[in-house]
């Protein structure tokens, strides 16, 4: 995964009020990932309300207030669709759901009060797209939920949300991702969604 993919996800959560931590600064290529290396981002919502409901499986910006804390896996396979066959044949998609990874993730967050006031640790998968045709779409969703994924976000949904929030008269010099999007939007190089 390239830094730009993770940068898009980071910007999306930050633009929606989350504190974001990048779990590691390097990419694992020539060996099997250790537990802590399966997590791409760790997100925390400081404005989460204690009595909030559980977020829907499809996360859009309107659902983010219901997320308290989460680990995020980014699968930026932009030319692929997460079909049932692809999901069954790609166990690396679910690597961040292993017990050793979840144990490591719980160590990264502050302790939840004994009264259970903290929200559950969600497992969020960022993916390019799901099949649009039935029964493949439903089968993909069933596989993702059965594996233990709590929510998914598509790159398309994130990019649309970011583009809607970008002002062309602002200078986003602290974010290469937002600055490039602003420039493209300023010169009408992006189609309206």
Tell where the protein language model's regions lie, with residue ranges.
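Intrinsically disordered, low-complexity Ser/Thr/Pro/Gly-rich regulatory segments
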Residues: 1-38, 43-193
